[in-house]
Amino acid sequence: MEFALSSEQKELRDLARKFAKEEIRPKAEHHDHTGEYPLAVLKKAWEIGLMNIHIEPRFNGAGMQELDDVIIGEELFWGCSAMATAILANNLALAPVLLGANDRIKKEFVQPMTEEFKLAAYAVTEPGAGSDVAAIRTSAKKVGDEYIINGSKMWITNAGYADWFFVLTKTDPSAGHKGITGFIVDSKTPGIIMGKKEINMGQKCSDTRGITFEDVKVPAWQMIGREGEGFKIAMGAFDHTRPGVAIGAVGVARAAMEHSIQYANTRNTFGRPIMENQGISFMIAEMARDIEAGRLLCYQAAWMIDNGFRNTYQASIAKMFCADMCMRICTDAVQVLGGYGFNTEYPVEKL
């Protein structure tokens, strides 16, 4: 396996890093304190090619791979996890569509995303169904050449700004996971009711809402794949997107470590920087170790899917490890900064 990034990947990393440093970091505090949705930042990310990177060239897209997404994601999450979540949410919504949709759907809904700024949302999670996707209760009943959708979704990123949703439904409740079907649903369709914006720690400017579908009529041709294939398509989408989710934790952890190093080198106690105390320096060394390990897990999972290998196990391991690693490093960063670690005037509190 080649561990070095290609020249194109290095350029992509540098582009994302520059954008995070110049466009995201300076605005992160404002958006976290106000909760204002960073629409202008998202539009700039779209303009320079950091969004929708997996759309196929035949639909005017860049056709990039999952490793490219991982490279971009680490830098954007280093800048601000909430803004990165909003910027990269399209990837999750697009994944099942790119995997399972026919060309008509891609021309109607996907190709326009390369021509003008548009957002999409992945509407799968429900109050009683998160990782247990087969437990969804949202229904879709066929009536003529339409399906009528009823049900509720929750924790839907970019819901209030999305132009369309990928919605997972049950078309045959008696068939278990084989009775699940996905649809693309235009957000302007009558019967869609938006819930209130949720205010989440570290994610205050990300637009996360519940969605209720009341007799929402969707043309049958907007079905993703065939009836009953929704669960399989959704699981395949997770294999593609979990490395990108996991690397977000690496980016946040890296930011926490850098803030810790900066503070530990400038904060003096008993006549010397606290970095010279082994209790601090060992803690930061462990941060660096775990960040490197997490990044490699993400790269491995992305490389596997890019090269035709099933990565379900590796992607799940990466997501599990990186989430716990990030939580631990951010907690340690608060300890390094002491009282400043949980003060809103300092960046570690938000992480």
Q: Which residues does each predicted region cover?
A:
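Short Gly/Pro-enriched turn/cap motifs at secondary-structure boundaries
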Residues: 86-87, 113, 128-131, 155-158, ...
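Short beta-strand-to-turn element immediately C-terminal to the catalytic PLP-Schiff-base lysine
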Residues: 98-101, 141, 167-171, 184-186, ...
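A short, Trp-centered hydrophobic/proline-enriched beta-strand micro-motif
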Residues: 116-124
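Short glycine/proline-enriched turns and hinge-like loops at secondary-structure junctions
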Residues: 64-65, 132-134, 158-162, 176-179, ...
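Well-ordered alpha-helical segments within folded domains of soluble proteins
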Residues: 89-94
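A short core secondary-structure module
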Residues: 146-194
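Flexible, small-/acidic-enriched active-site or ligand-binding loops
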Residues: 135-137, 188-219
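Alpha-helical interface subdomain recognition
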Residues: 1-83, 88, 100-105, 112, ...
